[in-house]
């Protein structure tokens, strides 16, 4: 396996396919780099260098007890970018991974970054607060943490329904995808899985938005039952100067799978533009 030993000894697993302008993919919760395989194959075949990593505590990366916060995740990305000496890199983050790449720019700047893509991302703020009334209530995330602690496998199996939107008429996702999703999710440590619920629900990225100074694409489904568009993608577009918004009508959270061809085409057009 290809890994990077981080500053605290954590082993960060990553895939590195193809050659050309680099695109670095940051995965969603509670998945791994494998969620990006279709995108990586697509871009590597078209002359790009596609890189995806397993966030600490997830997939094949090691499982530390602490460090499941966005400052740490951003610093992990910085180490990977430095290690691989990536320049003119396109950063793409899905769901909680959108927070990773956003915080990277806020903490480390955009000198090595060409563009940013936020797909079904939790930015700028996921949870409802006094000054952000459109997000899900804290009780929703309390329930997620409780469900994970009680029976993680069953909770995640059930969660896949709204993740892929298969409770909607006409939705079609194979049993193989459901099985793969659960298999990937259960590779993560329970501690990381639970702690990241707090990180992705409570981290306020609104101050980070003003620091994004590269062309940005926001992709979001308007029927996202996990990370509601009105609470996240819509506001991210409004807060990131000059960003481009692509709203997928009727699309669920997992657009990289359910709307793979459109995501790939939109990303390619954005990267080439």
Regions found by a protein language model. Name each.
Residues 27-29, 89, 93-95:
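Conserved alpha/beta-hydrolase "nucleophile elbow" surrounding the catalytic nucleophile
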Residues 72-89:
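Conserved acidic catalytic loop of the alpha/beta-hydrolase fold
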Residues 102-150:
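Flexible "cap/lid" loop of the alpha/beta hydrolase fold
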Residues 124-136, 146-210:
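Conserved alpha/beta-hydrolase catalytic His-Asp/Glu region
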Residues 225-231:
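Conserved alpha/beta-hydrolase "acid-adjacent" motif
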Residues 241-273:
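Catalytic active-site module of serine/aspartate enzymes centered on a nucleophile-bearing elbow/loop
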């Amino acid at each position: 396996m290809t890994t990077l030993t981080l500053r605290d000894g954590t082993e960060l697993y990553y895939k590195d396919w193809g050659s050309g302008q680099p695109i670095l993919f940051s995965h969603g919760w509670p998945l791994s780099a494998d969620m990006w395989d279709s995108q990586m194959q697509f871009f590597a075949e078209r002359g790009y260098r596609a890189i995806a990593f397993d966030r600490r505590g997830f997939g094949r990366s090691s499982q530390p007890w602490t460090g499941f916060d966005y400052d740490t995740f951003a610093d992990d990305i910085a180490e990977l970018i430095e290690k691989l000496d990536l320049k003119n890199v396109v950063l793409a983050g899905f769901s909680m991974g959108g927070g990773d790449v956003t915080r990277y720019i806020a903490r480390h700047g955009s000198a090595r970054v060409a563009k940013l893509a936020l797909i079904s991302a939790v930015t700028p703020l996921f949870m409802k607060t006094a000054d952000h009334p459109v997000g899900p209530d804290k009780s929703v995330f309390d329930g997620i943490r409780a469900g994970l602690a009680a029976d993680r496998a069953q909770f995640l199996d059930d969660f896949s329904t709204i993740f892929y939107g298969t409770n909607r008429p006409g939705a079609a996702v194979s049993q193989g995808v459901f099985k793969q999703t659960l298999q990937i999710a259960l590779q993560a440590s329970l501690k990381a899985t639970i702690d990241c619920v707090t990180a992705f629900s409570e981290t306020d990225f609104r101050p980070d938005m003003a620091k994004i100074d590269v062309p940005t694409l926001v992709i979001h489904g308007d029927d996202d039952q996990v990370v509601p568009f009105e609470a996240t993608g819509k506001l991210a577009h409004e807060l990131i100067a000059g960003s481009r918004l692509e709203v997928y009508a009727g699309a669920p959270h997992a657009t990289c799978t359910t709307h793979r061809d459109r995501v790939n085409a939109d990303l390619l057009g954005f990267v080439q533009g």
